[in-house]
A protein has these predicted regions:
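Acidic, mature catalytic/reactive cores of soluble proteins
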Residues: 1-184
Length: 184
């Protein structure tokens, strides 16, 4: 329903899509798509739509609650349960409210600790503000400004520079220099 995202993949059959969840909207993949669009001036309107919709996703009540919970208690990120307490990096492409990917009626367990995606998001958002692509009217909508401030505080409280995450390759949790670099 969004029309402003690039799905990781599309499938002819719903069963394959449901098994892989590559039909979800992924923050990182959408940001790379945004970068491709913004590099072509003829696609600047589409690029801005992608970035604003991602900003809206990061400003949803669920995302804001995750950030606030970690700011209040960074230990919520500890261990495997902490993977679901992290800011989420993907959502169901068919959800009108950007809800989690579901399995059997519950959010699918996933390692959402992917600070590289969060760092890339902040970097591109700041660049768009700096260039005037995003203006005051854009950032005043809803909880967008609040979500930026909370995300910065979340990364600080999470000690991103020593936090193990699954990184860009979504591998086992470890300290990834690519994640640390993108946040800094």
């Amino acid at each position: 329903p969004w029309g402003t995202f690039i799905l990781a993949s599309t499938f002819e059959d719903d069963k394959t899509a449901a098994e892989t969840h590559y039909d979800a909207v992924w923050l990182r993949d959408s940001l790379w798509g945004y970068m491709a669009l913004v590099s072509d001036q003829g696609n600047s309107v589409a690029a801005k739509k992608v970035l604003l919709t991602l900003w809206d996703y990061m400003s949803t009540p669920d995302q804001i609650k995750r950030m606030q919970d970690v700011i209040s208690n960074p230990k919520r990120l500890d261990g495997i349960p902490g993977q679901m307490n992290a800011v989420h990096i993907r959502f169901d492409s068919n959800s009108p409210v950007m809800a989690d990917v579901q399995e059997e009626g519950k959010p699918q367990l996933w390692n959402h600790k992917q600070n590289d995606a969060l760092g890339l998001y902040l970097d591109l958002l700041i660049q768009a503000i700096d260039t005037g692509t995003i203006n005051a009217e854009d950032w005043e909508k809803g909880d967008r400004l609040k979500s930026i401030a909370l995300l910065v505080a979340y990364l600080d409280k999470a000690n991103f520079y020593i936090m193990e995450d699954s990184g860009a390759w979504e591998e086992d949790a470890r300290l990834n220099t690519s994640s640390v670099a993108l946040v800094t």
